[in-house]
Amino acid sequence: PGLGLFGEVLPMRGMSPDMTDTQQRAVHRHNLKAMMLAHDSSVDEALIDLQQANVARDRMRRRRIARTDVLTQVQANWTCAVHGVWGELDALYLGTLQQVPQVLSKLASFTSVPDAGHWVMFERPDAFHAAVDPLLKA
């Protein structure tokens, strides 16, 4: 989000105050699969619990900023090296992932992790750590 590369609108579902806990959990499951994870099998009850807690704390209910290119605009102000790790199957960048290093030209490095969605660190932790650990040791 914030790269100006957001393509297709994702099939996200909304909540309503009259939903039961079971219905809310079904919406979270659907939304996690639609946006955050590449594999249905990655969604379990513990992850739904985490997502419920995340959504309850969310202060930006609308995602207008996600559809802007604000991050590309502020990269000139970065005062340290910024490295990017994306999941190759990130639903937010399907068809545009290869453009990320071009629009974020100030990235010190760009890594694409195969077989992972937006939450690459959750879905493919070993590959994520293989990409990030050397950066932290540098």
Where do the PLM segments sit?
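Glycine-rich, phosphate-binding/catalytic loops in enzymes
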Residues: 13-15, 99-103, 129
